[in-house]
From Swiss-Prot:
Subunit structure: F-type ATPases have 2 components, F(1) - the catalytic core - and F(0) - the membrane proton channel. F(1) has five subunits: alpha(3), beta(3), gamma(1), delta(1), epsilon(1). F(0) has three main subunits: a(1), b(2) and c(10-14). The alpha and beta chains form an alternating ring which encloses part of the gamma chain. F(1) is attached to F(0) by a central stalk formed by the gamma and epsilon chains, while a peripheral stalk is formed by the delta and b chains.
PROSITE patterns: ATPASE_DELTA
Name of the protein: ATP synthase subunit delta
Family, per entry: Belongs to the ATPase delta chain family.
Function, in words: F(1)F(0) ATP synthase produces ATP from ADP in the presence of a proton or sodium gradient. F-type ATPases consist of two structural domains, F(1) containing the extramembraneous catalytic core and F(0) containing the membrane proton channel, linked together by a central stalk and a peripheral stalk. During catalysis, ATP synthesis in the catalytic domain of F(1) is coupled via a rotary mechanism of the central stalk subunits to proton translocation. This protein is part of the stalk that links CF(0) to CF(1). It either transmits conformational changes from CF(0) to CF(1) or is implicated in proton conduction.
Subcellular location(s) per record: Cell membrane
GO cellular component: plasma membrane; proton-transporting ATP synthase complex
The organism's taxonomic lineage, starting at the top: Bacteria, Bacillati, Chloroflexota, Chloroflexia, Chloroflexales
Gene name of this polypeptide: atpH
NCBIfam families xref list: ATP_synt_delta
Transport listed as a keyword: yes
InterPro entries in the cross-refs: ATPase_OSCP/d_CS, ATPase_OSCP/dsu
Length: 157
């Protein structure tokens, strides 16, 4: 079976770490800058803040929204805990599927499962058909699996 790298899965720990760090930094900075004018807020922020967090905090102060920082940190934490609930799906076929076939499969998976991230793989040993993995469910409709089932049935009789 051909191996492919799912870049999205590889990036997930980095995304989680960045969001977690941002939430922690926002939560820690909120009491320091509460009620300060924008001109004074930059001076009380720690030097080791992520640049994006620093810019975000200063923008929130400038817009008069520093009172919402704890809610923002909480929202980031909730996002981390629940995620976007995107389900990963993998479709393996014996031959390369056309764009139209991939679109039909993706559309059907989204209809059944909601927000789905689908990766496509080719494995010529399947002979024909598809293997579809969605979360922990596997639908093996490959010719190889059907032939194996026939072989087992013949051996059992």
């Amino acid at each position: 079976m051909a191996t492919t790298i799912d870049a999205r899965a590889l990036a997930a720990p980095l995304v989680e770490a960045l969001l977690s760090t941002a939430a922690e930094q926002i939560r820690a900075a909120a009491p320091r800058i509460a009620g300060l004018p924008a001109s004074d807020a930059a001076a009380v922020l720690p030097a080791d803040l992520l640049p994006q967090v620093r810019n975000f905090l200063l923008t929130m102060v400038k817009e008069g929204l520093s009172g919402e920082l704890n809610a923002v940190a909480e929202a980031l934490q909730t996002y981390l805990e629940t995620g976007r609930r995107v389900i990963d799906a993998s479709v393996t076929s014996a031959i390369e599927l056309s764009s139209e076939q991939q679109e039909r499969i993706t559309s059907e998976l989204r209809r059944r499962y909601g927000d789905v991230h689908v990766t496509y793989h080719v494995d010529p040993t399947l002979i024909g058909g598809l293997i579809i993995r969605v979360g922990d469910q596997v639908l093996d409709n490959s010719l190889r699996a059907r032939l194996s089932a026939v072989q087992r049935a013949l051996q059992a009789s």
